[in-house]
Amino acid sequence: MDRPALPKSIKDKTNPWGPIILGILIMLGGALGKGSPHKVFNLTWEVYNQEYETVWATSGSHPLWTWWPTLTPDLCMLAQLAKPSWGLSDYPPYSKPPGPPCCTTDNNPPGCSRDCNGPLTYLTPRCSTAWNRLKLVLTTHHLNQGFYVCPGPHRPRHARNCGGPDDFYCAHWGCETTGQAYWKPSSSWDYIRVSNNASSSDATTACKNNNWCSPLAISFTDPGKRATSWTSGFTWGLRLYISGHPGLIFGVRLKISDLGPRVPIGPNPVLSEQRPPSQPEPARLPPSSNLTQGGTPSAPTGPPQEGTGDRLLDLVQGAYQALNATSPDKTQECWLCLVSSPPYYEGVAVVGPYSNHTTAPANCSADSQHKLTLSEVTGKPLPRKGSQDPPGPVQYHSGARQKYSLSGGSRGTMWACNTGLTPCLSTAVLNLTTDYCVLVELWPRVTYHSLDFVYRQVEGRTRYQREPVSLTLALLLGGLTMGGIAAGVGTGTSALVKTQQFEQLHAAIQADLKEVESSITNLEKSLTSLSEVVLQNRRGLDLLFLEKGGLCAALKEECCFYADHTGLVRDSMAKLRERLNQRQKLFEAGQGWFEGLFNRSPWLTTLISTIMGPLIILLLILMFGPCILNRLVQFVKDRISVVQALVLTQQYHQLKPLEHGRAIVK
């Protein structure tokens, strides 16, 4: 039997470009994973007990590391599942305060125990009854008692002798960094400050009503606002300054929720969407009402998804309609060409109004195209810079820096930053970073050519008297949002037509940007799929060279490892899809009732345009007809009176006057 031919050498099958491709994947993964610092997340600050169970939380939509609220949990909430001395060792979180309530002289609730107004004993304060919680309130608000807080594992090296959780991190004096005590403990490096959040009288009233009555106020210090490990949480110990120094453990952590699921690996669908513009469908005959025997009605199918050709054609058509509505003289004989090489969009800087918000509005929650950047911005901008920028010709808005706020531009505008496009700016991020942002209108790269230029191109002339000038749509329509439309309010039909044409172009731009986002997502999937193939080949080669210690040992080279950063990309794109849908809903909700009427009823446009002319003429006749008729009748009457006077005067003769001094004798 013949021996089978040996396969080719492994070296011949190994792609020499494999390490280079792997390095490019790592670089692209890291670049795509970097998001905008102004991106809005759903943040939740949680306070947990010693069992790491959340006992209090507050949520909000803000950029990362810009929202530092005051946390107000109750002291007895922190004692849930703590040591038995607190009386809540078996009490689950988020439960109502346990009873029984206190007895009063005016009203004794059923099952009450002890008189709330009676003298308190020196028993250890607990949280199991209203009377014990009242004792705890008087302890925490007492001038010579109170409580103190010691940091956990995040403390510096010189504080390592402060003990562990068994000592509540307060094994020695001097370990405390904050609290409510007569010596006012403080620190310059700890992350929080803790104090009482209610006066003694208010807390006493809440205790007598059988409620939680020992609220704390946990605020963040400057070192705490600079820390970026809040997602894993930090722990502290709290002890009462009374006999025995009872204590408990609590912690604070930040939860970033609403992260999208993992994207499955599959084929690249980018090329499948490269379709030419769709042709108009021919008119179809109405289906017969009689179904064939055994037949079933077909399920209605939705409209097919637009391809690349349709989206590009929509951009050109929207550009023409907007240009024709604003400058009809420029569209008599011209060519509008969509630029096929990047950059595909350009910004026109505008000086327009923007609003500040303490919470993220709907349009700010739209995680718009942070992966897209602008290489060209024209016009006179309204810039905003971070506080760490070098001095330059920029307008600082100091009023917005006094507290956290989000600056959102008017409709149709976006902020172009060095980190990408964003609908809103976080003033807290600007204070901490060196970002530079400009309020711009976004326009597609559509060049405007006159008819002579096209003729010269067709005739094949290669020599020009001067360099041909190509105007872009941004130069022709720049400032339409802040200038043309804003100034055209109240000018009648012309402003309404311009607004409608601009809205159509704006909708086409948003649709194209959405597809660009989808292409970036598909590119990220392709990179992940390619990295999986490369890693599988690497594992296969390691198995083949297992006797020699693996591929790296056989090649006598250093081993390379792949770090996958595409998880952040998947999370960002999932948020981006959700917020693009919110932006589309906001765009539809912003239309007036007049525009919405035409959008909901297409036949209404033809009907109104048909009957509007005769209806206006009829209204004019009804308004001015009686006046004109009265004037005509009055004119006829005047002419008739003159004719009657002439007829009467024809029957008489004028008498000659008598001479002076002559008498008539008969």
From Swiss-Prot:
Annotated site residues (Cleavage) in this chain: R466, E467, L646, V647
GO cellular component, one term: membrane
Residue segments, region Receptor-binding domain (RBD): 31-264
Motif annotated as CX6CC, chain positions: 552-560
Pfam families: TLV_coat
Region Fusion peptide, annotated ranges: 469-489
InterPro entries: FMuLV_rcpt-bd (IPR008981), TLV/ENV_coat_polyprotein (IPR018154)
Keywords: Cleavage on pair of basic residues, Coiled coil, Disulfide bond, Fusion of virus membrane with host cell membrane, Fusion of virus membrane with host membrane, Glycoprotein, Host cell membrane, Host membrane, Host-virus interaction, Lipoprotein, Membrane, Metal-binding, Palmitate, Signal, Transmembrane, Transmembrane helix, Viral attachment to host cell, Viral envelope protein, Viral penetration into host cytoplasm, Virion, Virus entry into host cell, Zinc
Lipid-modified residues, S-palmitoyl cysteine kind: C627
Residues covered by region (Disordered): 265-310, 378-399
Binding positions (Zn(2+)): D115
GO annotation terms (biological process): fusion of virus membrane with host plasma membrane; symbiont entry into host cell; virion attachment to host cell
MF-aspect GO terms: metal ion binding
Short motif (YXXL motif): ranges: 652-655
Domain notes per entry: The YXXL motif is involved in determining the exact site of viral release at the surface of infected mononuclear cells and promotes endocytosis.
Function (record text): The surface protein (SU) attaches the virus to the host cell by binding to its receptor. This interaction triggers the refolding of the transmembrane protein (TM) and is thought to activate its fusogenic potential by unmasking its fusion peptide. Fusion occurs at the host cell plasma membrane. The transmembrane protein (TM) acts as a class I viral fusion protein. Under the current model, the protein has at least 3 conformational states: pre-fusion native state, pre-hairpin intermediate state, and post-fusion hairpin state. During viral and target cell membrane fusion, the coiled coil regions (heptad repeats) assume a trimer-of-hairpins structure, positioning the fusion peptide in close proximity to the C-terminal region of the ectodomain. The formation of this structure appears to drive apposition and subsequent fusion of viral and target cell membranes.
Protein name as catalogued: Envelope glycoprotein
Classification of source organism: Viruses, Riboviria, Pararnavirae, Artverviricota, Revtraviricetes
Gene: env
